[in-house]
Amino acid sequence: MGGDTYGFGGVNRIRTVNVSQEEADFASDSLADDLPLLCCRHYPQASSFVSVLGVCSGWLGLLAPDLFIFVLTNILLSGFLILIAFRAFLSLIGAFARRTSKASEKDKSPPEVLSAAGAQTLPHYSVLVPLYQEAASVPGLVAALEALDYPTDRLDVLFLTENDDTATRQALLAQLAASRSLQTRAQILTLPDGMPRTKPRALNVALHRLAGGLVTIYDAEDRPHPDQLKRAAAAMQAGAGNLACVQAPLYAYNAEESWLAGQWALEYDVHFGLILPALAKFGLPVALGGTSNHFRVSALRRAGGWDAWNVTEDADIGLRFARMGERVGVISPPTQEEGPETLRIWVRQRSRWIKGYIQTWLVLMRQPVLAARQMGVLNFVSGLGLLSGAIGSALLHAPCLVWLLLCLLSPEVGLAPIGQIVLIAGYAVSAGAAGLAPNRTGANRWKLIASFWLYWPLLSWAAAIALYEMLRAPHTWAKTPHALTRQTPQSVQEAFA
């Protein structure tokens, strides 16, 4: 492992480190070696229960196909109806919690809100920034990190780069040279070639280097609220000992640039504005976002770090915390993100998400009885239900739309009453949740709601790609390109003034 310090203006301050192959391999394989049943490196085999259920279903399909279709359809529709009701409940609870939180914060001045994290008690904080082919995003990223309000003697920033990404490292060196506040706090780590080339592999390299305290992750396009670190530290200090992580809300700054970006932003507003706060309120498992989650380093290490082979390491670690008896909370200071504006970018990102959800589902169902015992039955059903719903709805949106069109065009084809209920309830609950969610972007909310039915079938396209990649390239990370939007993000000071 070699390192250099780059000097500018006669002062040597920016440290670069070449990560050894041994260290990188350990980051890739440590979870698989220590907790193999919780890692998706080796294709998870279904449990005996799932295998028996599959065999019985296959025999029923062969012996009585009409009965099989009837039973399967009603089971699926009933499951979706229960899930829709659960999401409606979470949306209402999330809306109430949000209004209560806003009211309580209005009664406090900023110093009082942050009093639990006084200047003398703030823990050491590490900020991890995994980057690949992100040279164009570096100037805005560095400006956003400079704006973070946290004592400089207790803050480290680790930029994680890949061996073949010289352009991003050069951009970092140039920007950091002009940043007096980051020069002494920043390190640039270069990972050697190796498999898998994923974000969690890079994060694990950094995790094993941290001294302790708290750690958070920001992506290249992120613009976090300046108070986010202090608020997270305050939440950790005020929370119970089993509070492993707090999640900050994410929202798109470019929601008005395209219809797809608007729909993506609306999903985020519902997810981070309603669903996650409700799950956290009841202590239910939370599939974390990929950025702006703030962890206790000790909790991450007890969990074995991130799964380097899972392409949605965020969802996976959230469910693993639940299996350990750890909880996830939420904080209010948000992070701006760049939403995908084109179909090509959206499909690449969404297919990776669905592939990762499938990987996470397979790990959870590898030993479902053990998982239920570890998490508690309610937590297990909640986590499994939301994960299954995300995968199942993505797979079925387009086929259901085709079936609905057939029902409308052909009198011979009828839609069962339970199907009608699921269809109406699904749209009604989604529209209601969208109306209750915070509109952080200023996009025309009702135009987006009216076009839900055009957006949802696209999920089936992404799901089909995810299934194909599960067979051909399960651990390949489809990178989402950034810095492509025509809309320039506001400066951090303008955005959160």
For each feature predicted by the language model, list its residue ranges.
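Membrane-embedded multi-pass helical conduit in multi-pass membrane proteins
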Residues: 59-113, 117, 385-473
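The conserved acidic donor/metal-binding loop of glycosyltransferases
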Residues: 219-223, 306-309, 321
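Cell-envelope/extracellular polymer assembly enzymes that use nucleotide-activated donors
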Residues: 123-126, 156, 301, 316
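Acidic donor-binding segment of Leloir-type glycosyltransferases
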Residues: 146-194
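Long helical/loop segments within the catalytic core of UDP-sugar-dependent glycosyltransferases
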Residues: 176-213, 226-311, 351-362, 452-455, ...
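Cytosolic-side membrane-insertion boundary helix
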Residues: 16-53
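Catalytic donor-sugar/metal-binding loop of nucleotide-sugar-dependent glycosyltransferases
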Residues: 318-336
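Acidic donor-binding loop at a coil-to-helix junction in glycosyltransferase catalytic cores
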Residues: 311-317
